[in-house]
């Protein structure tokens, strides 16, 4: 697990944290207009930040379960679309982790799609190749204001894996996560 520390300005006392995951850009069922609207809504708020939690694209490889030809764009075109779609969030990304769709490409070809996207968006230093523990410091701690200390919040980030389509698998994954945190 990677530790990521984000120190926000002391004058920022309150933030919103939004999670974007499983949008599967390039999947025929992806609501790209809905994704773009959500990104615009987040970008319009001065105190809004985002966690990119994997499966931003719908990449398939020759050996993956999904059909490599069912996506609408090539892997490179999907990366470019992700960079364009999430560009308004540049400077607002607290953390980025890959999902299983990005990990497929890394395992097959050694190309880390999530890092490429995060780096292009100015958040390469806030990328974790697996799980991340993100410490976000902001505002001033009311009990330690005279010392100039900020209040720090911790956020555990992981795309998750497995579980499939059955409820039993999802329950087992939640039990696994309960052992971690």
PLM region descriptions:
Residues 48, 95, 119-181:
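His/acidic metal-ligating clusters that form di-metal
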């Amino acid at each position: 697990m990677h530790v990521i520390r984000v120190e926000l300005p002391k004058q920022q006392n309150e933030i919103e944290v939004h999670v974007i995951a499983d949008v599967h850009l390039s999947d025929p069922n992806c609501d790209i207009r809905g994704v773009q609207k959500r990104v615009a809504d987040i970008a319009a708020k001065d105190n809004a930040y985002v966690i990119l939690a994997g499966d931003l694209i719908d990449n398939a490889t020759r050996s993956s379960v999904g059909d490599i030809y069912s996506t609408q764009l090539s892997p490179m075109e999907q990366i470019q679309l992700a960079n364009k779609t999430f560009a308004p969030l540049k400077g607002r990304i607290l953390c980025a982790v890959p999902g299983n769709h990005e990990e497929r490409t890394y395992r097959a070809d050694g190309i880390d799609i999530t890092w490429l996207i995060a780096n292009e968006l100015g958040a390469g230093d806030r990328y974790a190749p697996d799980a991340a523990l993100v410490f976000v410091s902001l505002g001033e701690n009311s009990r330690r204001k005279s010392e100039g200390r900020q209040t720090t919040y911790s956020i555990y980030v992981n795309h998750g894996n497995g579980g499939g389509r059955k409820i039993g698998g999802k329950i087992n994954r939640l039990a696994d996560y309960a052992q971690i945190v």
